[in-house]
């Protein structure tokens, strides 16, 4: 048997100085392969490389293999399906997916949609649907699949064949308001019984899938889930890998040995505007990255029509040419047809041109790529699900817009293609041999064979063997018993002389929860390498830090009470300096009721500045996912985290939280407020299973905490309650505060009374956003029911009859407290921390941002003057008396 020269090695390193010696070495390896197999050959080669390096030879490491399929023809398993029937089913789905998008855009070009992405990946999905992806049943938890967002039309088209969606549903693709429509992309919020995971914007799916696979192992290790052979599949595009989130976490699943994780990257070589790597090879680039990280890499580049040509490639010229061509050329080979490919690919060497001399231009154009060959794809999937010890990535080469012909196949404009004319549609029909008439093409009629047809029976039988229809999503599970408010008694009582922060109050609440025999095992504490910052190190010993391998070393602080304890059954997810990954773990835990049929309750605590601001897109996806859990913004408040300065001081997380519709945001000052909020959150999310989540800002400032006032719990949850009533007086002001600035508000009330004889009522506002949410809802109802009795919002009802003016101060931007201006029954002045943060002590910072007690008092006096309660000279005298510089620059400009 002739042995081909190895490429690209010789193609890039010059001529072989001793071909005879080279041939002897190659024949030796051939002999080992024949007699002892590939594993022995691999072992010998590794030993030789190691020996050469130890002997002083410089051997640069290359993580790339030849530009060929990883699985040779001889190692492909038998295909278990009927390819004839499967081709027809795939063709019907292709047609219906295309018709759905074109139909919508015939109505209006506003709707958009994507044809080309699913066209390139249809075979990748169909092999999975027919042979691999198990739906959840009573006996098996089911596989989890992150579908590439732009391929949603194909998933809908399959569901239509299965009878899960109707023709009316398809007709209302991307029209969810006016009819029974389908969401543009996978959105559990919009289709809660269909889609499991939101995968757009691009790049979110890969990281979420990684942490989902790890969380599955976490649940198994802790005995919450039975150990099963479930897999997490993630589909993404080659262009999508440019997103930092797509590649940023790929070393973690190798460390964790997540062989339950499979990535399928659809390498159609094109992104939205043009080639992904026109001057290079994206498959080789991705192979190097994943191989270097330690993944099992399977390349599916060439379809079966190339196999005979490769078998005849005795001199290695075909493989050499495959290596030499860049992706921009490969795109042209499919866009410009067989004659072009004959000239520019096979025409590089006379021997190659002779190899295809008996092939027509059409034959050459039909030389297929691996991602469109079900047998090659099945071989890759089969190898992936059976691989042990490492995650697998499958790099499947496809053609973007496959089947669209001149309308968009392999063309740069194909991603934006929403419409096809009648001739294009006929060409598509003929190419896939669809039983669709010219009249049906004009009408864009969907095709669905009869229920007793061979195809429909096959389609349903395959899914029945895999547990049922897919995708599918659970919406409710058995509720857990939630502790009553009295459970948190220690935080509801006065602390006396003891001073501590709301962060420490949270840690005590969390510690009590993990100790509870009922709900405790389902609590999932998540920290991004800040447990000691937040005073949580006591939990290290108590519940342990999860580690898939346990603890293989003696920790440096093993002689301490709170030593760093890692354990296979550890409860804490210690994610390192990694807010994106931490949040993905939070999503995995917060959706476990749906993905795994068991409730877990994540508590993710982090520097508040590095939350929504850092991973806002993931936070939005968390809301879309219907995640349930708690986000704790630690060291919150622009002046409360004093010395850390500009990049750390958070003055807007409470505002950003309001942008996510199902997020409930609170800014408590006292331990009892925090306890009331967390207990009610558990009740709503865990017992009543509402699809909401909580953002709570907690601080690192120590002070004494009073007891829960009688009757205050309802006001705490609704957003505000009266904390202290001022004495009698002709004039009066209402002071509102939240978080630690509430204490400055209380001090300002004392100052107003003591120095100026003006009493003040003080209100604790735990959530301006909840007050606004209620008020907007009431306003809307009143607007739509003009003849009904007018409803009154909670904030209006609470402040009705109060003698003003009203002054609000927070440690956040002024717009946070400004949210309720419309419903405050009097003059309303707001103070906040607009501007960049800076390093200094709390007193200095509060003076700088004008949220200290003196500034609050002056704001109150100024408002009284505007209302005619005091003269302006009184305000001027107060400014001088309190030592405030009226000419200092506005802090927002500094």
Regions found by a protein language model. Give the residues of each.
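Thiamine diphosphate
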Residues: 2, 19, 175-198, 204, ...
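Cofactor-binding active-site loop characterized by glycine-rich and histidine/acidic residues
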Residues: 81-93, 97-107, 114-256, 279-280, ...
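Generic, well-ordered alpha-helical scaffold segments in large soluble proteins
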Residues: 28, 32, 47-51, 92-99, ...
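A structural-propensity feature for long, helix-poor, extended segments
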Residues: 234-235, 241, 617-638, 643
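Non-catalytic terminal/interface segments that mediate subunit docking, oligomerization
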Residues: 76-97, 118, 133-136, 143-144, ...
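N-terminal amphipathic, basic-rich helices that act as targeting or association modules
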Residues: 2-162, 428, 499-516, 520, ...
